Amino acid sequence: MKLLIAGGGTGGHVFPALAIAQEWLSRGAEREVVLVGTQRGIEMKLVPAAGLPLETIRVAGLKGKGGTRLVKNLAMLGSGLSDAFGVLKRHSPAVAFGVGGYAAGPMLLAAWMKGIPNVIFEPNAEPGLTNKVLARLAKRIATGYEISARAWGEKAAVTGCPVRPEFFTIPAHAAGKPFRLLVTGGSQGALPINRTFVEAAALLAARKSELQIVHQTGERDYNHVRAAYAREEIQAEVLPFLTNMAERFAWADAIVCRAGAITAAEVAAAGRAAVFIPFGRATDSHQLRNAQEMSNAGAGRLISESELTAVRLTREIFFLLDQPREIEAMARKARSLARPGAAREIVNLIEAAARPGGKSGPANGQRDAVGT
């Protein structure tokens, strides 16, 4: 039985896809999987590296586009749908699973039109545009947060976000000196975070003997950030990209990071305190909602991009330095939110959708059966 997993673009889409693929394949030698993305996404590196087959389709985003770019991207929808039908013809999957990202839309629409059952995954507290549309076509919806599940009623199940297993084996936090701070803005880095740390370096230098920093910058800002720490003689390891993220989480006392759903889930799985700086222009402000959920639960602190300054950032870091009990409380609360069975629960939903009688779509006369 073959599972098709559609979506990608960022690690936040691809890592859950890989976790689901691994769980699916672990359930029997007869299981097969194929992943579908685009040629521009990080899946082009991560999926082959995991030893899994990858197909690509032509597609581009629509939200936030205008003028000639919007016209061009609209024209690509037809090409993407044509490519998607080709993928279905080559692989004949029993069920399709969408993890979000540009490829998920046309791929799951094509699957639905062919009567292949769909399951989608919405990791964020605020659902994205693609999943808002695909939810009408899906048999089941797996969500990362209770708040996003409410909109879809009984069709939705709160599973949590699939996280790589090594995050769950990280030992409980044990304080040490100097204070170990991990800074990460995702696979490409985060310009506002990098820029603010550069500006804050002179302020952080006042307590540099108490600090040890690992800062993942992305390629673009690497030299600039490294020079700022060196100028102030702050003990910092600056890297464009981190390949051993679970080990870095285990090392850290606290993490400064974005608030993508998978990042938040990794913070929870690792049981670490965090300062979340959500992407200010993320579609539908989903990162802000994720950060609010974690902050409201006592599992992290929140700085919005509009409030992000060198002074505010330094104040948050010095607060953590001075409040070891707060660090421990946030770490415990974060780990209490972890969902180690997320991949298993999602694959259970996929299997249920794939059982006889589980098909949907126009080929089975059920075009409007969802959400009515």
Region spans (language model):
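C-terminal alpha-helical cap of glycosyltransferases
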Residues: 319, 339-372
